[in-house]
Amino acid sequence: MEKLKIEYKFDLEDFIVMENIEHSYFLNDNITTAEEVMKWYEKNDLTCIGVRNADNQIIASVNILPLKKEVFKDIYENRMNEADVVYNQIEEYKDDNSYHIYLSSISIDKKYKNNYKVITTLLSGCMNLLDMLIKRNIKIEKIMADASTIH
């Protein structure tokens, strides 16, 4: 069984790999550029979870975005596309505060698409992130995810 690693630290090359994985599933209009996602991450380094394979390559990822309440509502009410989110609409986590969270761009490299271990590793990464937030007394007021593909 291939060794997988949950990852929370990324550079622009990692985000380019994630963007390319997304291009294998989504239309260009539904994809945020790697450069913009890097800005999200620079503002709040707990906005992305990845899975690396034994070769240290990113093979799966999800963005977990603490959005400003108005932006969250606009996406929920279909007035805004998630690909249009820019870094100044992302919140920085502060201890003892609450946030509106959007799970965005859940993507798995097609070679690993139906790999149970990859999927469960990515979900474990999400749970670990939520545990990190709990330890800082950060509350999630609302959470939302949207599916764009059929698997």
Place the predicted regions along the sequence by residue:
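Conserved GNAT acetyl-CoA-binding A-motif
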Residues: 98-104, 131-148
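Conserved acetyl-CoA-binding loop-helix of GNAT-fold acetyltransferases
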Residues: 103-108, 113-132
